[in-house]
Structure formats: C-alpha cells, structure tokens
C-alpha cells in the first residue's frame, strides 16, 4: 500500500468527496486508511464502570476507515497525485510524485 501514516490525502469519491485530511492510521492488510475529519460515524458506547476511568456511555462521533482507492496523496504543490518509487544512491526506496517527479 502506497499511502502511509502522516500523509495528507484528498478524498476522490464518496460522500466526503473533496475533503482533505491527514492519515491517522493505515491498515495495509485491509487496504484502508483512517483520515482525520473524514467518514465520521456515530458510535453508541455502553456505560463503563467508574473505576476504569473511561468516559461514560453515550453517542460518540469518530472517524471510520476508508478504502485506499477512494483517496489520493496530495503532493508538495497541493495537487492530488499518484505515487511511484525510485531508488537513491544507497539503494533505499523513495516515494515519488507521478505528477511532478518530486520526492514525497
């Protein structure tokens, strides 16, 4: 999966189309990413015991994972781009923007 934690992405399809956000977490096995402020859902949480220190029950709004095919990485110019790879002199793999050829 070419999208990693910390990348800024643009949602290209779905109800949140056009929204930009930072990747909070990536799930490569499921091909999904958790994007800050995108795909927010309401989750019903049960009351917890007071000694556990958790918040009491109720309805909590939080982000849900979104499939990687619905997002594109935003490059340094602020444009959505596809990701390619190249190897530097040390043989290390580096991610490259397909739009402008700059390192990501």
From Swiss-Prot:
Family matches, as NCBIfam families: rplX_bact
CDD domains: KOW_RPL26
Top-level taxonomic group: Bacteria
A molecular function (GO) term: structural constituent of ribosome
UniProt keywords, alphabetically: Ribonucleoprotein, Ribosomal protein, RNA-binding, rRNA-binding
Name under which the protein is recorded: Large ribosomal subunit protein uL24
Gene Ontology cellular component annotations, sorted alphabetically: ribonucleoprotein complex; ribosome
InterPro entries assigned to the protein according to its UniProt record, in alphabetical order: KOW, Rib_uL2_dom2, Ribosomal_uL24, Ribosomal_uL24_CS, Ribosomal_uL24_KOW, Translation_prot_SH3-like_sf
Described purpose of this protein according to its UniProt entry: One of two assembly initiator proteins, it binds directly to the 5'-end of the 23S rRNA, where it nucleates assembly of the 50S subunit. One of the proteins that surrounds the polypeptide exit tunnel on the outside of the subunit.
Species of the source: Corynebacterium jeikeium (strain K411)
